[in-house]
Regions:
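Bacterial N-terminal signal peptides
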Residues: 8-19
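Acidic/histidine-rich, surface-exposed loop or edge segments in extracytoplasmic proteins
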Residues: 26-31, 43-45, 62-65, 264-278
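Short solvent-exposed beta->alpha transition segments
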Residues: 28-36, 42-43, 58-123, 210-238
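Alpha-helical segment of the N-proximal tetratricopeptide repeat
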Residues: 50, 179-199
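Surface-exposed, charged secondary-structure patches
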Residues: 73, 80-148, 178, 237-278
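Short beta-strand edge/turn micro-motifs at domain boundaries
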Residues: 137-179, 259-282, 292-327
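TPR/TPR-like (Sel1-like) alpha-helical repeat modules
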Residues: 197-214
Length: 330
């Protein structure tokens, strides 16, 4: 199993996520752990964070599990991408979890902390992991604050003997285009009230992504957002499926739509299927056609985003992107 496969742009981890037909596994929170175990995990996490702040990927590689160390380009790219955010950053440990995956499971769920009659509480969490190799893992969640802002720095560690080795790393800013989860949540509610369900769904999704340090983690906060957005997902959005977008004589298959910071702006990213992007002139024309069609079909998008980035995407993942400001899409 390749422990350097990317699930999200900054996630290099050998763990996929999904709750289908899952079996419950054993999980302990920081307060459940004895002092020696908690201190060992915390010390390992802080030591790895220190290496990352210095850009010392060579040392990080030396203390990684073999599968990750054998293909370390993802970790190197993540650390390089966030070097300005991490330089001079001071870290605070926000959470430590011990996940006992000694029994292999194709769909494992780790329930951590105390749950109430209605489900999650302020101190609980659930982790959804697919095809997790047998072993004992820990998750260390760090808040890294620097002059650049707040960064969420999350480490997956795997126990080897008495040592805790790096098995995965997820680093992301706590803000997108200068806005945090609360801002996106407030805007989502506003769009929902106005009946702009496409904007509402996109902003609810961004709020949920920002509030969780890793995408395979559920908390009381993420559950509340999911409850709010339940039932408003438009059927014509490419969520877990492709969606046809007619554009003149052509029909494009949309793969995904999501918000993303481009410079200081909040833009909409639209990915669609393309057989070949080597002809960049043709790919550019297709991108422009997609942007015109998407804004014509969903005019509400002009209220929410500064621009659109269309990405023609081959089956291999190679893509070609074009950015246009909303005012230039006519």
């Amino acid at each position: 199993m390749n422990l350097a496969r990317s699930l999200f742009p900054a996630l290099w981890l050998a763990l996929a996520f999904g709750p289908l037909q899952a079996s419950a596994q054993n999980c302990q929170t920081s307060s459940d752990l004895d002092d020696a175990t908690r201190n060992a995990i915390t010390a390992a996490g802080q030591r790895l964070f220190g290496m990352a702040t210095k850009g010392d990927t060579a040392s990080l590689r030396q203390v990684s599990i073999p599968n990750l160390a054998s293909d370390f380009s993802g970790i190197e790219g993540t650390v390089k991408e966030h070097e300005r955010d991490l330089a001079a950053a001071q870290a605070t440990v926000k959470g430590v979890f011990l996940l006992d995956g000694s029994t292999p499971s194709p769909h494992a769920e780790f329930y951590c902390g105390v749950f109430g009659k209605s489900g999650q509480t302020a101190n609980s969490a659930v982790f959804y992991l697919d095809n997790l190799p047998a072993g004992k893992y820990s998750l260390v969640l760090l808040d890294a604050n620097s002059p650049q802002g707040r960064t969420l720095f999350s480490e997956i560690l795997q126990q080897e003997g008495t040592d805790w080795k790096l098995a995965g790393l997820y680093v992301k800013s706590a803000q997108v285009a200068g806005h945090d989860s609360d801002w996106f949540l407030a805007r989502a509610r506003g769009y929902k009230a106005k009946g702009q369900m496409h904007n509402a769904w996109l902003f609810y999704t961004q709020a949920r992504v920002l509030i969780s340090p890793v995408p395979f983690m559920g908390t009381l906060a993420t559950d509340k957002i999911a409850d709010e957005e339940q039932g408003i997902q438009p059927a014509d959005l490419p969520v877990g499926k492709t969606v046809d977008l007619p554009a003149g004589a052509a029909t494009y298959k949309l793969i995904s739509m999501f918000s993303q910071a481009v410079g200081n702006d909040l833009d909409l990213i639209v990915k669609y299927q393309a057989a070949d992007v080597s002809n960049t002139n043709q790919a550019y024309q297709s991108n422009v056609a997609v942007m015109k069609a998407i804004t014509a079909k969903y005019p509400e998008l002009r209220d929410a985003f500064a621009g659109v980035v269309a990405r023609a995407t081959e089956p291999t993942g190679r893509d070609y992107g074009t950015l246009l400001a909303m005012k230039d899409i006519k």
